Amino acid sequence: MGKRDRADREKKKSKKRHYEDEEDEEDDAPGNDTQEAVPSAAGKQVDESGTKVDEYGAKDYRLQMPLKDDHTSRPLWVAPDGHIFLEAFSPVYKYAQDFLVAIAEPVCRPTHVHEYKLTAYSLYAAVSVGLQTSDITDYLRKLSKTGVPEGIIQFIKLCTVSYGKVKLVLKHNRYFVESSHPDVIQHLLQDPVIRECRLRNSEGEATELITETFTSKSAIAKSVEGSGGPSTSRVTDPQGKSDIPTDLFDFYEQMDKDEEEEEETQTVSFEVKQEMIEELQKRCIHLEYPLLAEYDFRNDSVNPDINIDLKPTAVLRPYQEKSLRKMFGNGRARSGVIVLPCGAGKSLVGVTAACTVRKRCLVLGNSAVSVEQWKAQFKMWSTIDDSQICRFTSDAKDKPIGCSIAISTYSMLGHTTKRSWEAERVMEWLKTQEWGLMILDEVHTIPAKMFRRVLTIVQAHCKLGLTATLVREDDKIVDLNFLIGPKLYEANWMELQNSGYIAKVQCAEVWCPMSPEFYREYVAIKTKKRILLYTMNPNKFRACQFLIKFHERRNDKIIVFADNVFALKEYAIRLNKPYIYGPTSQGERMQILQNFKHNPKINTIFISKVGDTSFDLPEANVLIQISSHGGSRRQEAQRLGRVLRAKKGMVAEEYNAFFYSLVSQDTQEMAYSTKRQRFLVDQGYSFKVITKLAGMEEEDLAFSTKEEQQQLLQKVLAATDLDAEEEVVAGEFGSKSSQVSRRFGTMSSMSGADDTVYMEYHSSRSKTSTKHVHPLFKRFRK
C-alpha cells in the first residue's frame, strides 16, 4: 500500500480518536438518532444585546447591576449572561444554595464562591417541583446584591410561562390531562389534534371536564431530628443585631412553610385515549405546553400493591430524604433524575422510592454485576422476599412467576438479534407487565436511541434516573429531560464530604519523568504503541510500586486501575498481585474480591476498566491509576467513587482516602489528565501535583538499572498494536467490538514466528505506466 494512502488512513484514525478520547459512552452511530421533540424555548439563550463590550472583549455590566445599600447581607450576584455567583461564606448560604440547586445548573463549586448557570432545562426542573414564575423572580431579587437584569427576568418568564401548567396523570388506570389553570385547558381543547385524543362516550360525545379539589402533601415524611435543613432562626452578631434583612428572613420562612404545609389545589381535567398518549405529548410540546408526567400511585386500584417496606435499620440521610421529597413532593410520583456522588447511597434512594410507590418495579443497570448488587441492596434495605426478585441477564434468568421486582440490564432489553427460547419468554412477560416504577441506574451512560428502544419495550408509570456524573461531551444529556424527566435534585460533593457522609479524599497527580530510552522511542513512533510506552514507563512503574509499599505498611486497602490489559498484566505479575479483567471468570472475581475484603494478607488488587462502575468495595481507601481512557471526565469521577464510601474505624486525620493518578511527563497523557480532572475540580476537589515522591530513593524498587529498563523497552517494542489498545468490555455501550478494522500484526500471534512480519498492501502501479501521467498528478501522489 502506498505511503500516501497509509498517511491518509492514519490521519482519519487520529481524527476519529480525537473524539473517542473524550467519552466512551457517546458512540451512537450517525443518522440513527431521531430528533427529540422539544419546546422551542429550550433552545433559547439569555439576551445580552444591551451589554457593552470593550476593545478587549470584556463585558461591562455596571449599568445593569447597580449595588443595593445592604448588598453585604445578600449572597448572590446575578450576571446578565445567566451566570449566578453564590458566596459560600454567607450566613444564609444554606437557603440560597437550596434555591439555586432548584432553578440553575451547578457549574463550579469550590470552597468560597460557587457558580451556577440559568438554563431553559434548569428552569423547567424548577417549575416541575412546584416553583412558579413569580416565585423565582421574587426570590432572585431578594437574594441578589444588585438589581436583577431585565434580560434575566424575561428569560425566566419565557421558559416558565407555560411549562409545568399541564400534567398527564394516571388515575385508576385512566389517563387525564390536568391543570390548575382552566384557561390553559380551554386553549388546548381548541386544537383539533388534542380534541381527537380526548376520550368519547358510547354516543360519540366528548366526556365532560372534571373539576376537583385535592390536598397535596409529600409522600416522604420529613424526619424531626437531624433533617439536615438549615435553621430558620435569625443569625445575629454579638450585639444582638440581625445579619439578615427582614425581607430575606420572611422569604426563608415562606419557603419552609410552602414545603411543610398541606396545599389545597383546584384542578380541571379531561380524560384522553390511552392509545394516543404519544401523539398527545408531541402535540402539547408543539403548542409550548409540554406535559409533566405524574403517577397518582395511591389511587391506582388496578395495579396491585406489592408487599415491600423499608427495614427499621434503613435510616435515610438528610440529602437522600431531600431528594425523595422532590420526587414525591405533592403526594404523587414525579419522573426525573437524582444526582448523588458515588458512594453516597443512590441504591438506598432507589429502594426507598420502590417502597414508597409499592407497585411492581423494574430496575435497569449497565452490567450483570450491577444486577447482583441491586438484588443485594433490595434484600439489605427492604422486607421484600427473595422469591419476589427476578433477575434477567445472560447468566441468570430467574422464573418471573410471582415476581414483584425485576432487575436487568439495558443491553438485555435493547437486544435486537435472535434470543434463546427462555429469554424470549421472559421478554414477553416484561412487555406485558404494567410497571409502577422504573429505576434507571447510571442513566448518563446510555445513548438516547437506546432509551427510546427500552422505553417502547416496557411501559412504566414513573421513571427515576440515578447517576453521579450527569455529564457528556455531546449534547445528548439534554434528551433526558424529555425521555425521563427533569433533574429533581443534585447534591454538593464537598458538603457531603465535610459532613462525613463520604470519605475525605486527597487527590494527587504524580508526575513520572520518562526514561531517556523510552522517550526516544515515544518521539519516533507514531502508532498506538506510544500509549504503551508512556504506560510502561519504568519511572511510573517504580512510583506505583513505591506507593503500594508505602500504603501497605499503613494497612490500607489499595486498588490499581489500568485500562490497558498488557500493562495491567505486566504490573500485576511483576509485583505478584492478583488482577481482574474482562475474561476473568465470575468465580475467580468473587474469590479475589472476598480475599481483598477479608484477608489481611491481600491488600492490593489490579483491576481493568471492568471495575469502573460495577464493583462495590467499601474497604478500599487508596486508588492508583496507571492508565485511563483518554480525557474522560466521567471515568475519573467514577473511579474516585471507588474510594468515596465513608470509612469506619479510620484514624482521625485530615484525609482518610487517597487518589493517585500517575502521569508520564512530556507526553499526551498530561493533556488527557487535565481534561479528566475538570468535573472533579468543578465539584470543589483540588489536585496536588507531586513531582518527587519523598523516600523513593531509599526503597528497593524494580527497574533500577539500565539493563532492566532496556529489557522492558524491548518487551514493549515487541508488543503488537493490539496490545496497545484499551480493553473492550463485553456488553459495554459504545464498545467498538462490532466494528471491523485492518491492522498490521506479527505472525507470532498466529504461528509463533516472531521474526516474520505479516503486512497487507496493494501492489503499486507499474513504473512504466507513470511515464504518460501529467506531473501535476505525480505531485499529488507523493
UniProtKB/Swiss-Prot annotation:
Entry-annotated residues carrying Phosphoserine: 686, 751
Subcellular location: Nucleus
Top-rank taxon: Eukaryota
Pfam families: ERCC3_RAD25_C, Helicase_C_3, ResIII
UniProt enzyme class: isomerase
Entry binding sites for ATP: 340-347
Annotated stretches, region: Disordered: 1-51
Compositionally biased spans, kind Acidic residues: 21-30
Activity regulation, per record: Phosphorylation on Ser-751 by CK2 controls the 5'-excision activity of ERCC1-XPF endonuclease; phosphorylated protein inhibits the excision activity and thus NER. ATPase activity is stimulated by TFIIH subunit p52 (GTF2H4). DNA translocase activity by this subunit in TFIIH is stimulated by XPA, ERCC5/XPG and XFP plus ERCC1.
Residue ranges annotated for the Helicase ATP-binding domain, each copy included: 327-488
Modification after translation, per record: Phosphorylation on Ser-751 by CK2 controls the 5'-excision activity of ERCC1-XPF endonuclease; phosphorylated protein inhibits the excision activity and thus NER. Dephosphorylation reactivates the 5'-excision step. Phosphorylation has no effect on transcription or the 3'-5' helicase activity.
Keywords: ATP-binding, DNA damage, DNA repair, DNA-binding, Helicase, Hydrolase, Isomerase, Nucleotide-binding, Nucleus, Phosphoprotein, Transcription, Transcription regulation
Biased composition (Basic and acidic residues): 1-11
Catalytically driven reaction(s): Couples ATP hydrolysis with the unwinding of duplex DNA by translocating in the 3'-5' direction; ATP + H2O = ADP + phosphate + H(+)
Motif Nuclear localization signal, residue numbers: 6-18
InterPro entries associated with the record: ATP-dep_DNA_Helicase (IPR050615), ERCC3_RAD25_C (IPR032438), Helicase/UvrB_N (IPR006935), Helicase_ATP-bd (IPR014001), Helicase_C-like (IPR001650), P-loop_NTPase (IPR027417), XPB/Ssl2 (IPR001161), XPB/Ssl2_N (IPR032830)
A biological process from GO: response to UV
Subunit and interaction comment: Component of the 7-subunit TFIIH core complex composed of XPB/ERCC3, XPD/ERCC2, GTF2H1, GTF2H2, GTF2H3, GTF2H4 and GTF2H5, which is active in NER. The core complex associates with the 3-subunit CDK-activating kinase (CAK) module composed of CCNH/cyclin H, CDK7 and MNAT1 to form the 10-subunit holoenzyme (holo-TFIIH) active in transcription. Interacts with PUF60. Interacts with ATF7IP. Interacts with KAT2A; leading to KAT2A recruitment to promoters and acetylation of histones.
Record family assignment: Belongs to the helicase family. RAD25/XPB subfamily.
The protein's name: General transcription and DNA repair factor IIH helicase/translocase subunit XPB
